[in-house]
Amino acid sequence: MSEELKGEARYKSGVMPYKKMGYWDSDYVPKDTDVIALFRITPQEGVDHEEAAAAVAGESSTATWTVVWTDRLTACELYRAKAYRSELVPNTGPGTKNEAQYFAYIAYDLDLFEGGSIANLTASIIGNVFGFKAVKALRLEDMRIPVAYLKTFQGPATGIVVERERLDKFGRHXLGATTKPKLGLSGRNYGRVVYEGLKGGLDFMKDDENINSQPFMHWRDRFLYCMEAVNKASAATGEVKGHYLNVTAGTMEEMYERAEFAKSLGSVVVMIDLVIGYTAIQSMAKWSRKNDMILHLHRAGNSTYSRQKNHGMNFRVICKWMRMAGVDHIHAGTVVGKLEGDPLMIKGFYDTLRDTHSAKNLETGLFFDQDWASLNKVMPVASGGIHAGQMHQLLDYLGEDVILQFGGGTIGHPMGIQAGAVANRVALEAMILARNEGRDYVKEGPQILQTAAKWCTPLKQALDTWKDITFNYESTDTADFVPSTTASV
């Protein structure tokens, strides 16, 4: 800030550009304890990109539309967010078909945030700036969370390592399925679906995001029938099984009641939806750790703000916040399924959830090094439009610490639900065996599956039914620094 705009002169200025108010500082060097946010800014016509960045910094920290005398009662120089870097996004602006967009780096002093509160963090970072007139569009692309701030959060209630130990499942991916149809079944028929899937070889069955307590099936009935199915399948197979009982409800009191009932029935896992809100998610995470329960999060609603490339919020930020909040599972994309998912972007999401230290990688959309300060890892969930014929691709893209959920790919099997589960389990174990033998399971994948199908009729039926079905639409959210490979998956 120039000297002439400090002191009394500053407060006679009325309305000043945000840059001159101190929210732009190209010489600023972020501290290790700063929270850093990276925004994609599309300025309004005639607005300088540095001024737009300064406006976002100001309105997400201490500024209002005019200078105020009460600044002088605070450590205002410290508490102002500093936009310190703004650069043109590749393939935008002059000479391209896209209007100019800019990556703006903004640093926030740690004292601006309440410890252990996602709600407070988000109230500043995304609370007011997205409707600001100086920007035509705004997207939060990434954040660097300092270790000092991470240490104020619980992190995942259970974590991948303890979950595998608790469930006694090692050396392979976990398998699951969402009960279908997700609405309309009676409690008893719902339980029958759960039993058939688990008996056939799945590790988990799951409620879908919008099954709560409706006239056709009260939540208590669903819990009772599902846990009866879990116990019978566990006894029949000798394996630990589970069902994600969705405890999402209209109030925290109701959610706690449902979670306590799930625990009393012997469930190892409960489920919530992203739409319940950040504070409710953190509250359920604390309950889950206290009660030794795995917490599964369905990302219901995320695409309303994460899918568009120029406005909203990248899903990698949600991954970071949810790891801090304390969930154990989160749906994070499949690459080959029916939902949005560029391969490089999905890799960035999975790395964010599973790394102890995430290295900066612009190709996968990770703009910062991130030390996770010993917070537990989150198990990603791949769900939506996947089937046994894609098993080699899923293993290649997603790694081993992931739950592969085949809903329609289990329950839509022509020989029935249990056969669908058998097909998925055999396909997975055939691929794991090939991997362990050192074979190129990606290149040989189709042949490995065909060989296994010679002695497994359910797998043969699955391969014949779904063949090479994929959903190869180009993603809307793609990497900025390398070409998208979505269409060639």
From Swiss-Prot:
Enzyme class: lyase
Keyword Magnesium: yes
Lineage: superkingdom: Bacteria
Database matches in InterPro entries: RuBisCO, RuBisCo_large_chain_AS, RuBisCO_lsu_C, RuBisCO_lsu_C_sf, RuBisCO_lsu_fd_N, RuBisCO_lsu_N_sf, RuBisCO_lsuI
Binding site for substrate: N128, T178, K182, R299, H331, S383
EC annotation from Swiss-Prot or TrEMBL: 4.1.1.39
Matches recorded under SUPFAM superfamilies: RuBisCo, C-terminal domain, RuBisCO, large subunit, small (N-terminal) domain
Necessary cofactors: Mg(2+)
Keywords in alphabetical order: Calvin cycle, Carbon dioxide fixation, Lyase, Magnesium, Metal-binding, Monooxygenase, Oxidoreductase
Any GO MF annotation of the entry: monooxygenase activity
Active-site residue numbers: K180, H298
Positions carrying N6-carboxylysine: K206
One Pfam family of this chain: RuBisCO_large_N
UniProt binding sites for Mg(2+): K206, D208, E209
The protein's role, per its UniProt record: RuBisCO catalyzes two reactions: the carboxylation of D-ribulose 1,5-bisphosphate, the primary event in carbon dioxide fixation, as well as the oxidative fragmentation of the pentose substrate. Both reactions occur simultaneously and in competition at the same active site.
Family annotation (PANTHER family): RIBULOSE BISPHOSPHATE CARBOXYLASE (PTHR42704), RIBULOSE BISPHOSPHATE CARBOXYLASE LARGE CHAIN (PTHR42704:SF17)
Anything else known: The basic functional RuBisCO is composed of a large chain homodimer in a 'head-to-tail' conformation. In form I RuBisCO this homodimer is arranged in a barrel-like tetramer with the small subunits forming a tetrameric 'cap' on each end of the 'barrel'.
Quaternary structure annotation from Swiss-Prot or TrEMBL: Heterohexadecamer of 8 large chains and 8 small chains.
Protein name: Ribulose bisphosphate carboxylase large chain
Organism: Nitrosospira sp. (strain 40KI)
